[in-house]
Every structure is written in C-alpha cells, then in structure tokens.
Amino acid sequence: MVPAAKATRVSHAHRAGGPGLTLRENGPALLVPAAWGVAAGAVLGVVSSHALFVAHVVMSVLLVAFVAASWRDMAAGVLRAWKLVILAGTPVTLAGVVGFLARDGAVPAFAAAVPADALLAVAFYSWMLLPAPAFVYTGLRDPAVPRSLVHHVAAACSVAGTAVAALAGTQTGTVAGIALVGAGQTAGILAATALY
C-alpha cells in the first residue's frame, strides 16, 4: 500500500506574511459565493440595483487591493493564472460600474453615450467565464486527483451555467445558470484555497 502523497503547492514564488495573509488566502472562498448570491438576488428582485452597483464598486476596490497586495505571491504557477483572471476581471467589473451609472442616469454623459445594458452584460457573463481557464489550468497542475477533478468540474459549471443563463429567457432560468456557475466556482475556489 502506498502512503497518501502530501498535497504540494503548485505555486508560491514568495511567501508573504502578516495579518492580511489569511484574508488574502481565504477571502476568495467567501467572496465568490457571496457575489453569485447577490447576483441571483438581483435577478429575483430581492437585491436592489443600487445594492448591486455598490457591490460592483466594492468588488472593484477589493480586486485592485487584492492583486496589489499579492502581486509577488502571484508571480508564477497557478497563482499567476489567477492573477491574470483578476487583471482581466477588474476592467470588466468597472464596465459594470459604468453600466450602472449610465443606466441610472447618475452620470448624464454616460447615459447618452454608453450602452448600459451591454456593459452590464459584459460584467455578468465575463465573470461567469473568466475563471474557467484558470480552473482548468489549476486542475492540470494539482497532483491530488479528487481535488483536481473539482477544478475541472468548476470550469465545466462556469461554461454550462453561462449557457443556461444566456439562453434561459426567464428569471428562473437565469437564476439556475447563476446557481450552476456559483456552485461550481465556489467548489473550485475552495479546492484552490486548499491547494494554496
């Protein structure tokens, strides 16, 4: 009988220290399900569009702060793949902020010049899909077979949930797509957090 192999870290060029490290390591595992829960709540009318706007602003700040604080830690391997997701996701999230400002008329110049619904759709669908390649890469680099499968399932849920939400045509269908994405990405980020 072969003893179970200890999970190896597949990244970590520089180990950071300090009180913020635990939050940086575990924060995504809390924020991912929260973000998709808020999105589903907005579709169902439980969360106001203003609250969703505030969530976009807060998330934009958190993304920039997270990547700035973790820049050196995310220089290679799996963490570099996730840094690229954050770097691509920050302007996408900001597009959502601008979309809300244009749609609500808070900035009159945006309301006339910016396609609000298109920007909101870019933010919504991009965050459904952006993590998928990083989940695949993480799964390929993760030596623990059960956990690596979770990464691949997370990628599949991201793509399938996006398709469900895009093709649904109903509130219930859109929420089902969000739930599929949220469940997959939450499982994947929990597995990735364990890998880190």
Residue ranges of model-derived segments:
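Membrane-helix interface and helix-disruption motif detector
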Residues: 42-57, 98-126, 166-177
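Membrane-proximal helix-loop-helix units in multi-pass membrane proteins
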Residues: 83-152
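Membrane-embedded alpha-helical transmembrane segments of multi-pass integral membrane proteins
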Residues: 35-40, 55-66, 88-99, 127-137, ...
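C-terminal ends of transmembrane helices
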Residues: 65-79, 136-142, 186-196
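Terminal transmembrane helical module of multi-pass membrane proteins
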Residues: 142-196
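Membrane-interfacial loop-to-transmembrane alpha-helix junctions, especially the N-terminal start
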Residues: 25-30, 53, 75-87, 145-154
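N-terminal topogenic module of multi-pass integral membrane proteins
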Residues: 1-77, 195
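Extended hydrophobic/Leu-rich segments
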Residues: 19, 23, 107-114, 191
